[in-house]
């Protein structure tokens, strides 16, 4: 059976010191080898940094945001978030209350025919 095509991208934005890139990549490398990505439907992840900002691009068959509440208390999700908490901070801590608050809004898409 062919793989289901990627139909949704989520971009998470936060703050991260460039010196933490390796540690953050290692945390995701470990997690991505387990079940958490499949629990959320994630099929690809790319991490970027730029002048103290952290960009986390997730590709999935469906929007991952609705699945977050069901996995937020799962030990695998808690473990990743605890480890990342040492390296990543909210873009705007005063307005952040959940992962959804860090998700960028897509306002334009183009694709070749």
Residue ranges and their predicted role:
Residues 2-4, 39, 46-48:
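Short, conserved, surface-exposed binding loops centered on an aromatic residue
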């Amino acid at each position: 059976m062919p793989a289901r095509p990627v139909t949704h991208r989520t971009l998470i934005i936060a703050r991260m010191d460039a010196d933490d890139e390796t540690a953050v990549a290692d945390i995701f490398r470990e997690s991505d080898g387990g079940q958490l990505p499949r629990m959320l439907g994630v099929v690809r992840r790319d991490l970027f940094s730029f002048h103290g900002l952290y960009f986390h691009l997730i590709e999935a068959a469906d929007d991952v945001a609705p699945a977050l509440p069901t996995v937020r208390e799962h030990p695998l999700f808690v473990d990743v978030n605890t480890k990342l908490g040492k390296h990543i901070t909210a873009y705007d801590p005063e307005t952040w209350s959940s992962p959804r608050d860090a998700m960028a809004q897509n306002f334009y898409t183009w694709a070749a025919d």
